[in-house]
Amino acid sequence: MTDNAVVYYKEKKAGLLKKTEDVYEFEYDSDYLKDAEAKPVSLTMPLTQKKYFSERLFPFFENLLPEGFLLDMTIAKLKIDRNDKFNLLQYVGQDTVGAISVKPLKEGA
């Protein structure tokens, strides 16, 4: 997995989620912001041209992750460190129950 993931709202590219050594960053896509029907990915992350920063994975995205038995099964199957929430999100975030999905950024995209 990469350290960059594309966040979609109902199949529309809403923004880019990045993980660096020190911080997580989320930025809405400029084309998404121009869409009159654009909705924020979370009430805690209103639509804005400014970037959001956090020392840990943003709570909204962390809440997309499985818990308990499902988390145990997922990390065992994928062989991902339980604390590597960003890579875990890129796997499980591709098929969520709600309107938001998170997919790894493909090279050259």
Model region roles, listed by residue range:
Residues 1-109:
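Phosphate/dinucleotide-binding and metal-coordinating scaffold of catalytic cores
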